Amino acid sequence: MRDAANLCWKLAAVLRGQAPDSLLDSYAAERKPHVTEVTRRAVLVGRIITERRPWLAAIRNHVVRALTRIPGANAVGQKFWWIPEAHYDDGFFAAAHPALGRQIPQPTVDGVPLDDLLGGRWTLMHTGAVPVGAAAWAAAGAATLQITEPSLVRWLADHKADAVVLRPDGFVYAAASSGGRLPAPPAGLNLTTLTGAPA
C-alpha cells in the first residue's frame, strides 16, 4: 500500500505535465530502505518460526506463550517485528527538519478519519496561528487545516513542529517550528489539482 501511495501521486504529477520526470527518481530513494527492512524482518521471523532444533524451538515456544499473556504485547510485537516506522531519510522533501519524511498519524478528527479529511491533497496543517510562509502554499493550491485533535498536536510537538505540509501520500514534505518560516512550495507543481487520486 505504501508503495502504491508513494508512486500514485508522483505518476499523476508527471503524466499531467505538472512535474518533471525526475520526481519519479525519489520513489526508489524513499521506498527501497523501507522494503529492505521489511524483508529483513520477515526473513528473521521466518527463521524463528521454522526453527527445527528441539531445544531452540522449546525456548521459542516458551517465550511466545509468555509474551501472549502480557496485555498489549501482541500489538507491540507486531510493530517491532513486522512494521518499521514509516519514515524516509531521503527523497522529495524540503529543507531539513526533524518532522520531514515522517508519515502523519491517522486519528479520527471530528468523527472523520484523517485520511478522508485530507483527501489525498497537499495540505498545510498547523496548531496555532497561521505560520509564516503559509500564503505561498495557499496560492499554490494546498489545503489548510488547523488542528486541535490531541494526538496530532502531540505528534507535531514531539517532532518540534507547529506546522507541517503533507504530500498527497501523507508524508511530511515541509515543516516549521514556532515562529519559523515554512519553506516555499516545490517549483512547478500545481498543488490544486495534484492529488493522490487517479488521473
Per-segment meaning from a language model:
Residues 1-12, 23:
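Extended, hydrophobic alpha-helical segments in both membrane/secreted and soluble proteins
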Residues 13-199:
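Helical substrate-recognition/capping region of FAD-dependent monooxygenase/halogenase enzymes
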